[in-house]
Amino acid sequence: IDQTYHSFAVGEQVIVMQMQDDVIGTNTSNNTNFGRLSNIQSAGAFDISTITSVNSTTIVLNAPLQNNYNINSQSRVQVTSFRKLSTGDYTTTGNITALAWNGNVGGIVAIQVPGILTLAHSITADGKGFRGGAVSANYESTCQPSVYISSSTNFGGKGEGIFRNTNNSYATGRARILNGGGGGNDDNAGGGGGGNFTTGGLGGHGWTCETNPSGGLGGIELKAYSNGMRLFMGGGGGGGQQNNGYSTPGGAGGGIIIIQANVIKTNCSGNVKISANGINPVNTGGNGNDGAGGGGAGGTIVIQANNFNVPASCPLQVSANGGNGGNVNHTGAHGGGGGGAQGAVVYSVSLPATNITTNTLNGIGGFNSIGGARAGSASGVDNEGIMTGINIVLPVNLISFTAKKDGFTSVLSWTSTDDNSIDYYIEHSTDGIHFNTIAITKGSGKKKYSYTHRTPATGKNYYRLKMILRTSGLSSFSPVAYITNENTSMPLAVFPNPSSGNFMLRVQDKGQEFTVIITDLMGKPVYTNSYRAVNNAIEVHTGNGLKPGTYIIQVANKNYKQTGRVIIN
């Protein structure tokens, strides 16, 4: 567990996300199909869960993950903190910036505030996503449009994307590698733009390669999977090809930002922003007569807030724009970088407009020469990556959940910021692993809830809440709470047993009032009544209400509990 930048703690919510997966399939030949998507697998899938224990090698979560995650040499799964900044309102004290993705960790900012999140500063993940491709070595030959994959450094490096490449034979060449842009080929072609919601732009053709264009292909679009159930970082742009030492590497893609709050407001003297933009590569240097890098694609921003309060004095800019391709600073036509694709911005409500500007813009292709034609821009229509009315993070902040022993009953209490669309499934377990639903409480906006479990088992009783959003079926779990019931008595004596439905129970306390609960073997109550013990015995009359079979009997009051079985014939 890498805790260099953050120490995980018990009770902390975390996000488990499949950053990369083995999605390339058989698209590995040296042709234009290299690097296309075969099967999305689990790429972009994520879960939100809570830590119940942690040490230097292991994190234990409070519930099984709902998605499947793949761990192999072509994949990466990351666990990152979904940090709760406060138990109420919170005002930023400085800019919040994502850690740059390094191939294992980084690229994500995820914060939650139960009340009002006041932005006095910006939250950014610009260029913190998938990394851009490297420039080639100094090399010159004729135009080489048919080299799609290679291990040679004579060609520009491919940008990074949702497939983790460990094969050096795929490292360079003009083919994209999923949403990572392809590298520029000889002679002096530009790198392709990274992809995300749309496709990255084609790198510029290269020196004297107008009829044999050798620019990097743009990274693929992931629009079909950007439905709120998967989140993607922007693909890196491909690197430029050079023979004079003036090329530039591809731009990195934007990272992922997740913000959950009841209200988002701003308070500043200028403006603030929430941005996950792709990077614009620098223009070719020196004499400029080499290929430029492709732009990084925009990342993904998720804003789950019920209301916004943004005054004109402090407007908010939200953007997941693709980076523009690098320009060639030379009068002769070489290869500008392809434009990076737009990313995605996901709101849980309709698009907020008052003093808020939201953009997902496609990156523009860089100039192939000073004042000349441009390389390819990213495809699609600007701002089509803006999505509204999508709840992907459960819109409930569970402030507390406790279990307390009250005699032989368990009293569960919880407090949340409830929006009336949550169902609380109360789950019980005797081993902390296998849970069963014992009750359902519908959220009513009252924020404070309780439930009494009247038939807990002897020994440890574990409880948790499964919180389900009615509109989408999305769910998350509370931390696990438990109580312990001591076994202070012998098993309950029942006679006659088997019985026709009328029988006696031997108890230890005479003259006391008891509750008798009879359940089936699945734990469903089928009979409940109150009795007073006479001479340490209770006479139970169920009539003809019980079908033949085996039942569990519990006799309890505030200070006493016994459990036994009865067979009805």
Where in the sequence are the language-model features?
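Short, compositionally biased serine/threonine- and acidic-rich segments at solvent-exposed termini, linkers
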Residues: 393-489
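Short proline/glycine-enriched turn/loop motifs at strand-loop junctions of beta-rich domains
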Residues: 418-422, 508-514
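Short beta-strand elements bearing conserved aromatic residues within extracellular beta-rich modules
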Residues: 14, 424-426, 514-516
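Short, surface-exposed loop/turn motifs with a glycine/proline- and acidic-biased composition
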Residues: 442-463, 532-558
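Glycine-centric low-complexity/flexibility signal
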Residues: 96-302, 319-346, 361-392
